[in-house]
């Protein structure tokens, strides 16, 4: 029906998994995650993929014949039982307008759907009504395919890459796709575990226990209790928290911690209509450690493995792009008042760092500091974290 330019939507579980994205990632980070250590064959293969991808010519749009600006991956999707197979049949050159029309989901979320439909109709010499009918069917197919959770990637039609490189790239894509990794729009590699509810429930219960022991307060929602605390109670809570974490070798910055609790209770924000509203904060937070770029993937994978053994694999992330120097590995905790979990998570981190010979401080930053833009050097003397520890403080030798 549409012979020259046919829209095709990527199933939701496959978002972010592409040659284009993989070619932009740091091979040491990716291969460290996939293999749990440095794998030279993998690093060489990803480097070769990157060189090949960025050398591809962009001459003429295969749909309309104008100057091409994009290399589009021609993925086909099929279903085998309860699993899906994503087959890359090859690459096509597209101009900006035809590339937008090919990816209607992107066009829709960016307010350019009508523009994309007009392009589909124009290039295929059909009516806009017919183009919209095809688009409607495309979204229905996308909805069905997105319900499939298990996928396998098959790579074909990649002339210019050796079979060895294609085999490694295919393995890497299948590993990250089937092991709960995602690539965000700003190229963070992120892992999300499968027992989210269990971890959040444990964290909430631990926070409620701290509030009960520190202040004698009962309730079912730790955030609601914190919101209603008086200034005096905040001070008592911080002291109790400091005592509890100090017993684990974790230092608590009392001023910063009290600030975080006050921000959880809400901060004033000017809305789009000019009115001032109260924006509630989050009880979540994350441990951060800055490690050499060549070790980030290895650290991340080993930390995830350790957390999974203790059923604490919640959210872990690190920058995926090629960057020199030291960059963070970040491990999330659902509630920064969950004393036991805060300690258990950092214990896993420290064991991995100790095994790899990395001696760096670990800092815990509450999400409310991120929300309020409290970063190092920008907070008027306020540290951008509330807890810190290290191998020495934890008694590692």
Task: Specify the residue positions occupied by each region the protein language model found.
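A boundary/linker detector
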Residues: 1-52, 58, 68, 111-180
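Histidine-centered nuclease catalytic patch
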Residues: 53-54, 60-93, 102-109
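Short microdomains enriched in Cys/His and/or Lys/Arg
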Residues: 78-96, 114-130
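Short active-site loop/helix that positions an aromatic residue
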Residues: 80-83, 301-307
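Short, conserved charged micro-motifs
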Residues: 85-86, 294-301, 338-344
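Polybasic, proline/glycine-rich intrinsically disordered low-complexity segments
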Residues: 125, 176-182, 308-397
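Charge-rich, low-complexity segments
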Residues: 167-283, 372-397
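Short glycine-/aliphatic-rich beta-strand segments at the starts of folded cytosolic domains
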Residues: 283-291
């Amino acid at each position: 029906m549409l012979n020259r330019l046919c829209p095709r939507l990527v199933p939701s579980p496959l978002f972010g998994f592409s040659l284009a994205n993989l070619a932009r990632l740091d091979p040491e980070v990716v291969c460290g995650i996939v293999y749990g250590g440095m794998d030279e064959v993998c690093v060489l293969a990803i480097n070769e993929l990157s060189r090949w991808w960025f050398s591809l010519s962009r001459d003429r749009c295969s749909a309309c014949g104008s100057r091409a600006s994009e290399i589009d991956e021609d993925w086909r999707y099929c279903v085998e039982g309860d699993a899906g197979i994503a087959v890359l049949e090859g690459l096509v050159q597209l101009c900006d307008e035809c590339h937008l029309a090919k990816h209607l989901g992107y066009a829709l979320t960016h307010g350019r759907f009508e523009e994309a439909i007009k392009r589909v109709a124009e290039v295929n010499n059909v009516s806009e009504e017919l183009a919209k009918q095809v688009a409607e069917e495309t979204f229905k197919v996308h909805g069905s395919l997105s319900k499939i959770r298990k996928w396998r990637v098959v790579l074909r039609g990649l002339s210019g890459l050796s079979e060895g490189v294609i085999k490694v790239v295919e393995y890497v894509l299948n590993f990250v796709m089937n092991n709960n990794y995602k690539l965000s729009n700003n190229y963070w590699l992120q892992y999300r575990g499968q027992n989210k509810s269990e971890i959040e429930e444990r964290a909430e219960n631990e926070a409620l226990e701290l509030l009960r022991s520190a202040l004698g307060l009962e309730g079912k929602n730790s955030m609601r209790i914190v919101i209603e605390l008086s200034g005096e109670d905040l001070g008592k809570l911080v002291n109790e928290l400091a005592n509890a974490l100090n017993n684990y070798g974790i230092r608590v910055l009392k001023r910063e911690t009290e600030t975080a609790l006050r921000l959880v209770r809400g901060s004033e924000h000017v809305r789009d209509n000019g009115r001032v509203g109260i924006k509630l904060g989050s009880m979540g937070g994350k441990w951060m450690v800055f490690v050499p770029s060549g070790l980030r993937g290895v650290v991340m994978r080993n930390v995830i493995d350790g957390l999974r053994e203790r059923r604490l694999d919640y959210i872990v992330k690190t920058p995926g792009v090629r960057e020199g120097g030291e960059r963070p590995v970040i491990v999330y905790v659902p509630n920064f008042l969950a004393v036991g979990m805060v300690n258990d998570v950092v214990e896993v981190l420290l064991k991995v760092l100790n095994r790899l010979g990395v001696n760096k401080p670990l800092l815990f930053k509450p999400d409310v500091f991120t929300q309020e833009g409290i970063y190092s050097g920008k907070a008027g003397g306020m540290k951008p974290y509330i807890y810190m520890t290290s191998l020495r403080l934890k008694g590692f030798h």
